[in-house]
């Protein structure tokens, strides 16, 4: 089989638009970009070409409306649905297209967490074997992860073909995962992010949001601090993901997916984050034309200027990272017992342990969590954190020393760390940046 023609449904959304660009450029496919209006579709074509920095691919991009779906779908080798994250909207699309899909076509959904089995069952029985989850990460031009999620009905040979196509043609880092809540990357990433949001509320008297983000900055192995990441993806999207995980899981970390009240308050006020220029953070231009970053103060419910925090452990880590002395950097973290250093180290330890828990539920390959976090979030992979902290034995000692006995009992530490790979395929040194 060859994928020459693709229909992307919901192509005006951020993911639908960006993925259209990937199919057209890397996949060299003709792409029908179907939107609810032609005006939206034409704007989406221009954005898609720009997203992959190749305006020449515009000739591969065809604007279309939902009224055109029967003809577009009948021509397509792959139909990629990227509409709103709710079953009702997706079922409406399925009813629109089901009678027009070729029996050899691939039906993919870009859902970030809805049940693939449940979506498959919305299709006529004869099409269920052709349906599969294909979860990309934004922006896909730089974040190469593609989670492939078969349903219980998915044809195995078709799944193998799609994985190879995504790897070879679309140049993706492909991870096959089970149909579990939020799959793999988002389950790990949003556990970390939402617990950081919870800690901001716990430590609101110390500064709250920007205080926790300063503790978990770039020097801890991620391009963007965690709470700022929630602001970047959108607080409504963040809520949808963590609510889904909370409602559909029963593991030891379930309570860390409870959305903090202050985030719900911001959502209710329409302050959804960067996409509306106001959320957990906002940028204000003063009278002199200078941009000043403000942060939401949880206690007062107002915005204040973002603080410049100075933590001795962070300064030592950053100085050592600049010098390339990684052992000294992590020694300064492990040997500092300030509240900020304790929070930082505990988050790194819990990140590793939850990653291992999640990957065992979603994959047969423990390295899959490393691939998911490195190429889906740009975060230091969890197994690489173990390497950075001194190896498995040192990591186990740190976990026993720094986590509460109650949490350790729920985690079942020795069982969780049993049969770990010898190390990560990724070099941790490329992820820990000398920046706060």
Enumerate the predicted regions with their spans.
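N-terminal glycine-rich phosphate-binding loop for ADP-containing cofactors
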Residues: 1-436
């Amino acid at each position: 089989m060859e994928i020459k023609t693709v229909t992307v449904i919901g192509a005006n959304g951020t993911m639908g638009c960006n993925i259209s660009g990937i199919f057209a450029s890397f996949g060299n496919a003709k792409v029908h970009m179907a939107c609810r209006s032609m005006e939206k579709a034409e704007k989406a074509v221009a954005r898609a070409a720009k997203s992959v920095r190749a305006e020449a691919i515009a000739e591969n991009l065809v604007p279309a409306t939902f009224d055109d779906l029967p003809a577009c779908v009948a021509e397509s080798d792959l139909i990629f649905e990227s509409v709103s994250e709710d079953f009702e909207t997706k079922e409406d699309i399925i009813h629109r297209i089901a009678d027009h899909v070729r029996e050899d076509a691939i039906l993919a959904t870009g859902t970030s967490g809805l049940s693939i089995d449940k979506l498959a069952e919305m299709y006529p029985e004869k099409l269920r074997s052709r349906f599969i989850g294909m979860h990309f990460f934004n922006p896909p031009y730089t974040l190469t992860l593609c989670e492939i999620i078969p349903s219980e009905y998915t044809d195995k040979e078709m799944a193998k073909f799609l994985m190879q196509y995504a790897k070879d043609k679309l140049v993706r880092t492909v991870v096959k995962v089970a149909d579990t809540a939020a799959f793999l990357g988002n389950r790990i990433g949003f556990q970390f992010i939402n617990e950081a949001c919870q800690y901001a509320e716990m430590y609101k008297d110390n500064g709250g949001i920007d205080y926790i983000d300063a503790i978990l900055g770039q020097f801890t192995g991620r391009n963007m601090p965690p709470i700022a990441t929630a602001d970047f993806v959108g607080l409504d999207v963040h809520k949808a993901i963590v609510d889904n995980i909370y409602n559909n899981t029963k593991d030891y970390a379930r309570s860390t997916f409870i959305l903090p009240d202050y985030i719900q308050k911001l959502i209710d006020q329409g302050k959804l984050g960067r996409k509306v220029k106001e959320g957990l953070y906002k940028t204000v231009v003063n009278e002199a034309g200078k941009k000043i970053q403000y942060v939401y103060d949880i206690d007062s419910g107002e915005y204040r200027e973002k603080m410049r925090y100075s933590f001795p452990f962070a300064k030592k880590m950053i100085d050592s990272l600049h010098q390339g002395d990684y052992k000294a950097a992590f020694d300064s973290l492990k040997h500092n017992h300030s509240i900020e250093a304790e929070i930082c180290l505990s988050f790194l330890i819990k990140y590793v342990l939850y990653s291992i828990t999640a990957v065992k539920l979603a994959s047969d390959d423990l390295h899959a969590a490393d691939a998911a976090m490195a190429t889906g979030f740009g975060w230091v992979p969890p197994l690489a954190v173990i390497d950075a902290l001194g190896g498995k034995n040192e990591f186990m000692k740190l976990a026993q020393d720094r986590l509460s006995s109650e949490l350790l009992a729920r985690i079942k530490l020795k069982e969780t760390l049993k049969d770990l790979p010898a190390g990560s395929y990724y070099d941790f040194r490329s992820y820990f940046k000398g920046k706060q």
